[in-house]
Amino acid sequence: MGMKIGNDPFHKRTATGIGDQFMRQAVRKAQDGLRVKKLKATESLGNWEEWRALGEEIRKHTLENLDYYLYELSENIEKNGGFVYFAKTAEDAREYVKEIVKKKNAKKIVKSKSMVTEEISLNEAIEEAGAEVLETDLAEFILQVNDHDPPSHIVVPCLHKDKEHICEIFKTKLNYTGTSDPTEMARFVRSYLRDDFFAADIGVTGCNFAVAESGSISIVANEGNARLTTTLPKTLITVMGMERIVPTWEELDVLVTLLCRSSVGQKLTSYITGLTEPGGTDGPEEFHLVIVDNGRSDIVGTEFQSVLQCIRCAACINVCPVYRHIGGHAYGSIYPGPIGAVLTPLLGGYDEYKDLPYASSLCGACTEACPVKIPLHDLLIKHRSRIVEEKQSPVAWNVAMKGFEKAVKSPRLFSFAAKSAPYALKPLAKGDKIERGIGPLKAWTDARDFPVPKKQPFREWFEKHVKENDDGHSKS
C-alpha cells in the first residue's frame, strides 16, 4: 500500500470526505465517545499533567540518545539469539523480509496490526516473494477483505465502516450467512482465521516499544491475534520504526500507561505481549527485528525532532475538528490527523504533501491532547514557514501575499483599499453578506458567511472616536 493513499489532489479528497455523511457521522460518534473515555481513564491517575511531563521527558531523553539505545537494543537482541537488520530505506526493509520468505520457502504468513509495515508496502513485497499474507487484526482483516481498503485512523483503521457495511463485505467476499451483530461477526472471523495461525510459516508484527536494556519487544493490543502471531509460527519478523524504543522496563510502564488511556480510554489493554528471546516453549524458533529508518534519521536533530516522540495513540486525531469533517482518507496518507499533517510531509516530501500543514485550524487541541506533549500546532506553523521559504506554495498565493504585503506597508494604499472594498465587493453581495466569492474566496463563501466591509474603515472610525473623547475630556 505504502504511505500514500490515492492519487486525487487534496481539494478533491476533502470534498469527497465532506460529502460522505455516513463517514462524518461515524467520526463524530467515535471522537465524542473516545474523548469521554479518555477523560475518565486519565482522572484515575491523579495529576495527568505530571504524567504527560514524565512521558515527554522519557521520549525526549530517548531521542537525544537514540544511537546509544539502538546499539544497546541490537546488542541485547543478538545476545538473546535474534537477528537485527537496520533498514535505511523502505526498499531495504522489503528486500530483507523477502529474502527470509524465500529462504524459508514460506507460503502463508500471518500478520498483526502495524502502521510501519503499511508505510513500507511490506504486504505487497511478501506477495511478490510468492507468499500469502493474512491480516489478523479484525479491523485490518476487514479492510484487506474489502479489496485492500486503506485505513482511516491510526488505532481504529476501519472507522469509516459501520457494522452493516462490514456484514455486507463478509457476505459478499466470505460467504458469511450471519447477522450484523458485532459479536457474531467477530466469532466468524476468529473461526475463519484459526487454522491459518497454525498453518502459518512466518508471523509478522509491528512493535509498540522495544526495550533496550533487555532486547525485548512489546505489543499492546485488545485482540489475541498478536499473541498468536508471536507464538505459533516458527519464524517471527518484527518491524519497527527506529524511534519506537525505550531505555528500560520502567519507562515502558509509564508509556504503556499513557498509551492505553490516551488511545481508547482503557487503564490497560486486554493483551500486552512481550518477547525477549526465541526458542522458548511458547515462542518462535527464529526471530528477526527490522529497524526502519525511511527518513526518520533526517528528522533527528531538526526543529521537527519532537514529532518522533509520538507513541501512536491517536489522541490528537480524536480531538481534531478538521479530521472530524474530512475524515482520514482526505489526508492522502496512512498517517491522518494532526500527527499525519506533521509527519507525512517529513517522510514523503512537500512535493506530494505540501497541503497537509494547512489542514488545521491551529486551535491547539491536538497539542493539549498529546500524552507526550508534542507541540503539534507549532510544528504545523513551522511547516508552513518552510513551505513559503522553499517557494513550495502556489504561485497565485505568493502573488496575493506580495500584494497584501505592499498594501499593509503603505498607509496610503491600505487606506485606499479599505475605502474601496465595500464598493468593489457590492456586486457579489446580498444584503450585508457576500454571497459568492471570486477565485480562492469562493471556497470560503460557499460554506461561510462573509460580511461586506463597512463603508467607514475602522481606522477612520477610531480616529474620530478618539478625537470626540479627547474633546469631551477637554471641555470638562
Curated annotation (Swiss-Prot):
Q: Which cysteines are joined by disulfide bonds?
A: none
GO terms (molecular function) for this protein are:
4 iron, 4 sulfur cluster binding; metal ion binding
An example GO biological process term is: lactate metabolic process
Q: Which residues bind [4Fe-4S] cluster 2?
A: 320, 363, 366
The organism that produces this protein has a lineage beginning with: Bacteria, Bacillati, Bacillota, Bacilli, Bacillales
| Role | Is involved in L-lactate degradation and allows cells to grow with lactate as the sole carbon source. Has probably a role as an electron transporter during oxidation of L-lactate.
Gene3D superfamilies annotated for this entry?
Alpha-helical ferredoxin, NagB/RpiA/CoA transferase-like
Similarity comment text for this entry: Belongs to the LutB/YkgF family.
Coiled-coil annotation reads none
Q: What is this protein called?
A: Lactate utilization protein B 1
Which HAMAP family does the record associate with it? Answer: LutB
Enumerate the spans annotated as 4Fe-4S ferredoxin-type domain: 301-331, 350-379
Which keywords, in A-to-Z order, does the entry hold? 4Fe-4S, Electron transport, Iron, Iron-sulfur, Metal-binding, Repeat, Transport
Q: Which domain of life is it from?
A: Bacteria
Which residues take part in binding [4Fe-4S] cluster 1? 310, 313, 316, 370
